[in-house]
């Protein structure tokens, strides 16, 4: 066991991580920090992050130069808080991760896919408003 000391209080490793998790939850609850759950994944990590996920995953196929993708980004951050614990949200940069883009026949961006149990459940191509994305997620999880 590793002992961690904070303010002269000792914690075993497991207790320390529970303490950190509890502290973060309090900070989120009081809006001191945001969830920021939109995570970037890669060709290498896609199966582990998305296909093997216990939760449904909303994935945005995006690129740095894509204007509509940049418009959706902040909406996805908001939705990550609203759907916290119900879905995970990932982004895949198609320029850097072409294998995944080819595997899922991505021909236009932004493309949003909802994947559950390793299977594509729904797909949306193009920009969307927050209300459209809420409806898309709610109807497909």
Where do the protein language model's features map onto the residues?
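Short, Lys/Arg-enriched N-terminal segments with co-localized hydrophobic residues
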Residues: 8-35
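A short beta-strand-turn-helix
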Residues: 39-56
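Short pre-active-site segment immediately N-terminal to redox-active cysteine/selenocysteine motifs
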Residues: 54, 62-65, 108
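Conserved helix-turn-beta segment immediately C-terminal to the redox Cys motif
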Residues: 56, 73-92
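Conserved redox-active cysteine motifs that mediate thiol-disulfide chemistry
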Residues: 61-75
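Structural micro-motif
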Residues: 105-113
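Non-catalytic, surface beta->alpha helical segment in thiol-disulfide oxidoreductase systems
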Residues: 116-141
